[in-house]
A protein has these predicted regions:
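Membrane-interface extramembranous regions
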Residues: 1-127
Length: 127
């Protein structure tokens, strides 16, 4: 950590907390649908391929998201940030295949870029 510029600490902590808490909150909400009805974001392709009810599938998605958020907040931040990045890119592809929600797909790609930045900052910080 001696080569890590301490001026980057604020950015690293902001990314780590944001990319850790957001998946935990969104993942937990997959069970309650307070923020939104998450099943409406599943593409018709996904609902045909996945042999589960949409709500059941979203519960599984919620568990994965909560685990990813916890990993980001743990000592495995770099691994967690890669998982969050890949997960968000997968969500963006799903959103694009709905034929709607292009704005959300772009947002998720941008958040994935933030997760990539966190992985790179963490790598330098841990070096």
């Amino acid at each position: 950590m001696k080569d890590f510029d301490s001026r980057l600490d604020t950015a690293w902590w902001a990314l780590r907390i944001g990319l850790g808490l957001a998946p935990i909150i969104a993942g937990a909400d997959k069970f309650f649908n307070i923020l939104t009805d998450w099943t409406m974001y599943l593409s018709p392709l996904a609902t045909r391929v996945v042999p589960l009810r949409a709500a059941t599938f979203m519960h599984i998605v919620g568990v994965v998201e909560m685990i990813a958020g916890i990993v980001v907040l743990s000592r495995w931040t770099r691994i967690g940030s890669w998982v969050v990045m890949a997960w968000l890119l997968g969500i963006a592809v799903n959103l694009l295949t709905t034929g709607m929600f292009y704005d959300l797909a772009v947002r998720d790609v941008e958040i994935a870029v933030g997760a990539f930045a966190l992985s790179q900052l963490t790598a330098v910080r841990e070096a």
